[in-house]
Amino acid sequence: MQQGIPVELSPSKVQEHIAAGEKFCMIDVREPWEFQTAAIAGSNLVPMGSVPNRLQELEAQADQSPLLVICHHGVRSLNVVQWLRHQGLENCTSLIGGIDQWSRDIDATVPRY
């Protein structure tokens, strides 16, 4: 992905990047029960409350590929991305509309709740 990754990306833009062979490290910041209800294949659960304690881990992952931060509707993920950027981790973006929008636009097999 180019330098200057946007703060937010739409599901269709994420899909375009993936189709072009680009990789994301997908970080789901929802609660465990939400993750069990619906998840994007390949995403990793890092509940929002645990993000500060896992900052070094997230920085290491962001060195490998951009972090795509996911939540239910895109609010928590945007807050996490803004916090990460404030900590100096710029290689991250929030999924606009969250997993709900992903289910509607990209993969209808992901349950909506």
Placement of each model-derived feature along the sequence:
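Rhodanese-like catalytic fold shared by cysteine-dependent sulfurtransferases
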Residues: M1-C25, P32-P66, V75-Y113
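Short, surface-exposed ligand- or partner-binding patches at beta-edge/loop junctions that are enriched
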Residues: I70
